[in-house]
Structure formats: structure tokens, C-alpha cells
Amino acid sequence: MEAVLNELVSVEDLLKFEKKFQSEKAAGSVSKSTQFEYAWCLVRSKYNDDIRKGIVLLEELLPKGSKEEQRDYVFYLAVGNYRLKEYEKALKYVRGLLQTEPQNNQAKELERLIDKAMKKDGLVGMAIVGGMALGVAGLAGLIGLAVSKSKS
């Protein structure tokens, strides 16, 4: 599962599917499969703007798809949001998938990895806030020391 989350699309694939998508769009109608393939590539990009664009395309597809297609759309919506560190949204999608398919092992593993990332980022966030608080307290102490010495 971690391989799926960390996999990057090749530039060649991204360009190939973008060209196909743009060609169909210019002709007036993009097929669901073409839109999904392009979105799937975008979600695996190393650029956050591409990932966001892929998420938008997947969200557009969601109401149009069959049950099987929706499962894929929701899964990659969770993956895209995970890659953007939008863990709450990623969890929303993966838990929705687990409601309809409680035995889906891929979704269970993705949920576990999202929870793990949230805990890790939460701890890192707390450490940063704690470090900033110590820095402010230290600075206040130095200012207090300087003021008391200047009065002496």
C-alpha cells in the first residue's frame, strides 16, 4: 500500500493521458475512462497542483460511475488527499468505502496508514509548537534579565 501512496507517475504517461484528455475535451466529450486515467496520473504526480486537479476530476466522475467505478474513484480520492496531507478528507473517503465494503483490505490498510500519518504529523506539530513556546519563554527571560541589569 505504501508503494501506491508513494508511486510517482512518469512524465511520459502524464503527457500521454493529458493529450488524450485534451483531445477528447476539444472534440466535445470526454469519456469516463479517459477522465479517470488522466485523474489517476495527476493524483500520482509530484506536484500538489496536479494532485488537486486530479481530485477535482475524480470528484466530477463520482456521481456518474457504476459501483465498481465509484470504488476506484473513492480510493484514489483518498490517495490524493493523503498525498496532500489532507488526512481528514482522506479518512472520510476511505471510511465511506469501508462502509460499503467492510472487508476491503486495501481500504483497511489505507485507513491504517492515514491514521499513522495523522499521529506522526500531530506529534511533529506539537513538537514545533512546544519548541516555539520554549523559544518565546527564553526570549522573554533574556529581555527580563537585560531590563533588570539596566536598572542596576
From Swiss-Prot:
Modification sites for N-acetylmethionine: 1
* Residues found modified as Phosphoserine: 10
So which stretches are on the Cytoplasmic side?
Answer: 1-122
User: Which superkingdom does the taxonomy of this entry point to?
Assistant: Eukaryota
Effect the entry attributes to changing residue 42 to P: Less than 15% of cells display fragmented mitochondria
Alphabetical UniProt keywords: Acetylation, Apoptosis, Membrane, Mitochondrion, Mitochondrion outer membrane, Peroxisome, Phosphoprotein, TPR repeat, Transmembrane, Transmembrane helix, Ubl conjugation
Which GO BP annotation is one of this protein's?
Answer: response to flavonoid
| UniProt GO MF annotations | identical protein binding; lipid binding; molecular adaptor activity
Q: Which GO terms describe its cellular component?
A: cytosol; membrane; mitochondrial outer membrane; mitochondrion; peroxisomal membrane; peroxisome; protein-containing complex
Q: What is its main location?
A: mitochondrion
Record has Cytoplasm as a keyword:
no
Residues exposed to the Mitochondrial intermembrane side: 144-152
UniProt membrane topology term = Single-pass membrane protein
Location comes to: Mitochondrion outer membrane; Peroxisome membrane
Among CDD domains, the record links this protein to: Fis1
As for PTM, the annotation reads: Ubiquitinated by MARCHF5.
Transmembrane parts of this sequence: 123-143
Effect caused by changing residue 151 to A: Protein localizes to both mitochondrion and endoplasmic reticulum. Protein localizes to endoplasmic reticulum only
Q: Where are the TPR repeats?
A: 71-104
Q: Which family does it belong to?
A: Belongs to the FIS1 family.
- Free-text function comment from the UniProt entry: Involved in the fragmentation of the mitochondrial network and its perinuclear clustering. Plays a minor role in the recruitment and association of the fission mediator dynamin-related protein 1 (DNM1L) to the mitochondrial surface and mitochondrial fission. May not be essential for the assembly of functional fission complexes and the subsequent membrane scission event. Also mediates peroxisomal fission. May act when the products of fission are directed toward mitochondrial homeostasis, mitophagy, or apoptosis.
Q: Which PANTHER family match?
A: MITOCHONDRIAL FISSION 1 PROTEIN, TETRATRICOPEPTIDE REPEAT PROTEIN 11 TPR REPEAT PROTEIN 11
- Domain annotation text? The C-terminus is required for mitochondrial or peroxisomal localization, while the N-terminus is necessary for mitochondrial or peroxisomal fission, localization and regulation of the interaction with DNM1L.
Q: How does it assemble?
A: Interacts with DNM1L/DLP1 through the TPR region; may form part of a larger protein complex at the endoplasmic reticulum-mitochondrial interface during mitochondrial fission. Interacts with MARCHF5. Interacts with MIEF1. Interacts with PEX11A, PEX11B and PEX11G.
Name the chain's protein. Mitochondrial fission 1 protein
> What organism is listed for this UniProt entry?
Homo sapiens
Q: What is the lineage of its organism?
A: Eukaryota, Metazoa, Chordata, Craniata, Vertebrata
